[in-house]
A protein has these predicted regions:
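Glycine- and Gly-Pro-enriched alpha-helical subdomains that act as flexible
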Residues: 61-114
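Generic alpha-helical propensity signal that fires on short helical segments
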Residues: 21-34, 72, 85-90, 96-97, ...
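Weak global preference for isoleucine
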Residues: 6, 22, 54, 67, ...
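Intrinsically disordered, low-complexity regions enriched in acidic/Ser/Thr/Pro/Gln residues
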Residues: 1-69, 73-75, 80-81
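General structural feature for long, well-ordered alpha-helical segments within catalytic domains
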Residues: 43-46, 50-53, 66, 87-90, ...
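Extracellular/luminal Protease-associated
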Residues: 101-133
Length: 133
């Protein structure tokens, strides 16, 4: 019996001899490189403010733990807060909220409690948000 090493990455299933996930990742990264994000301001005080907001906002995390939160901010002030057990889903909820409400991403900051994956960074770029924390 032949053993094949199979791994998962942020873009799906990757097999060593046939790596469509890698090709897809390269194509996606190349597409994102050409995106021009607006210049944005970030102040240290806003980072402290966002951290305070996300850590004290009434949430499932405070009740149960093991929940990822994302807050969309403008100049450190929360505009939208979402939670999900999946950190990618929390980002997707922000994207959906922005779409439904016609929110201009140019002056926004996305702050997330989850560790950042390549896919989350790419999603943020595609959303047009210039700052990801």
């Amino acid at each position: 019996m032949t053993q094949v090493a199979i791994a998962y990455d942020d873009f799906g299933l990757v097999a060593p001899d046939d790596a469509p996930g890698i090709e897809s990742a390269v194509a996606t990264l190349e597409a994102v490189e050409s995106v021009a994000l607006p210049k944005a301001e970030l102040r240290t005080s806003w980072l402290y403010q966002m951290t305070q907001t996300i850590n004290t906002m009434p949430s499932l995390y405070l009740e149960a733990g093991a929940i990822h939160g994302c807050v969309l901010c403008k100049e450190g002030e929360p505009v939208c807060y979402t939670e999900d057990v999946g950190r990618h889903n929390a980002v997707d909820k922000i994207a959906g909220w922005m779409f439904r409400h016609g929110v201009d991403p140019a002056d926004k900051i996305l702050y997330t409690t989850g560790r950042l994956t390549t896919e989350m960074v790419i999603k943020t770029v595609r959303m047009g948000i210039p700052i990801l924390v």
